[in-house]
């Protein structure tokens, strides 16, 4: 009986070990395939009212309606109501570099807000404001003219009569949900329109609204 128990234990251990080796080998093979895949980077000028994903059960417009490239995913999000640069890639290291706060990668937005922020509001945005998920990092904030390269939005924004609007150039080094909108609302100037212009070295230059392009990725970028 003692020998039978020992034999069963040996079989169980051997079976477990073989199962572990198979699972480990499968993971290694999958990882190897991913590492051997060519790195792809797609830049997309996302229109208003397009979801930053490839599928949607509700039938709304998604990236699939514009981009035929498979196996790439957005580095960070860009709200359905926001426009501009979306970087899509299959390179996990690049995604981390563009999105993780610790990497301090700058992202530039052009933001139309209600009203004209005074110096106190601008300085608050520059030094950081406290939102419901904590204080924001210092940001670059400038009042600028409406960009001359900007396309018309469809539908246009809803402006209130007798209330002026202004444009801000905002540079962030972090990325929280709806962060720019929450920041401007916090200082009393709701965002009316938001366009992301750049993420790190990637920009909208040369991309019309709704247009995408694939670029070569440098090995040591």
Swiss-Prot record:
Please report the name of this protein according to its UniProt entry. Answer: Ribosomal large subunit pseudouridine synthase E
Q: Where along the chain is the active site annotated? A: 79 (nucleophile)
Key word rRNA processing present? yes
Gene Ontology terms: biological process = pseudouridine synthesis; rRNA processing
Q: What EC number(s) are associated with this protein in UniProt?
A: 5.4.99.20
State its role.
Responsible for synthesis of pseudouridine from uracil-2457 in 23S ribosomal RNA.
Question: One short Pfam family name for this protein?
Answer: PseudoU_synth_2
Entry's CDD domains? PseudoU_synth_RluE (cd02566)
Family membership, please give it.
Belongs to the pseudouridine synthase RsuA family.
List the InterPro entries.
PsdUridine_s_RsuA/RluB/E/F_cat, PsdUridine_synth_cat_dom_sf, PsdUridine_synth_RsuA/RluA, PsdUridine_synth_RsuA/RluB/E/F, PsdUridine_synth_RsuA/RluB_CS, RsuA_PseudoU_synthase, TruA/RsuA/RluB/E/F_N
Please name the GO terms that the record assigns under molecular function. Answer: 23S rRNA pseudouridine(2457) synthase activity; RNA binding
For this UniProt record, the keywords arranged alphabetically read as follows: Isomerase, rRNA processing
Listed PANTHER family = PSEUDOURIDINE SYNTHASE FAMILY PROTEIN-RELATED (PTHR47683), RNA-BINDING S4 DOMAIN-CONTAINING PROTEIN (PTHR47683:SF2)
Enzyme class name: isomerase
Q: Which reaction does it catalyse?
A: uridine(2457) in 23S rRNA = pseudouridine(2457) in 23S rRNA
Q: Does the keyword Signal apply?
A: no
Organism expressing this protein natively: Salmonella typhi
């Amino acid at each position: 009986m003692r020998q039978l128990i020992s034999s069963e234990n040996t079989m169980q251990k051997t079976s477990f070990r073989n199962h572990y080796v198979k699972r480990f080998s499968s993971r290694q093979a999958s990882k190897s395939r991913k590492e051997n895949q060519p790195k792809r980077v797609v830049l997309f000028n996302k229109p208003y009212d397009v979801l930053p994903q490839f599928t949607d059960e509700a039938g709304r417009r998604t990236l699939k309606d514009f981009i035929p490239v498979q196996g790439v995913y957005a580095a960070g999000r860009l709200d359905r109501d926001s426009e501009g640069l979306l970087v899509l890639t299959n390179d996990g290291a690049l995604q981390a570099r563009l999105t993780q706060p610790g990497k301090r990668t700058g992202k530039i937005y052009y933001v139309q807000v209600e009203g004209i922020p005074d110096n106190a509001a601008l300085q608050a945005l520059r030094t950081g404001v406290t939102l419901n998920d904590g204080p924001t990092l210092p940001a670059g904030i400038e009042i600028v003219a409406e960009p001359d390269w900007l396309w018309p939005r469809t539908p246009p924004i809803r402006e209130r009569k007798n209330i002026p609007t202004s444009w801000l150039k905002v540079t962030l080094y972090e990325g929280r949900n709806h962060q720019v909108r929450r920041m401007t609302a916090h200082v009393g100037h709701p965002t009316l329109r938001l366009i992301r212009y750049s993420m790190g070295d990637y920009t909208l230059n040369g991309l019309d609204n709704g247009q995408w392009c694939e670029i070569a990725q440098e090995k040591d970028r």
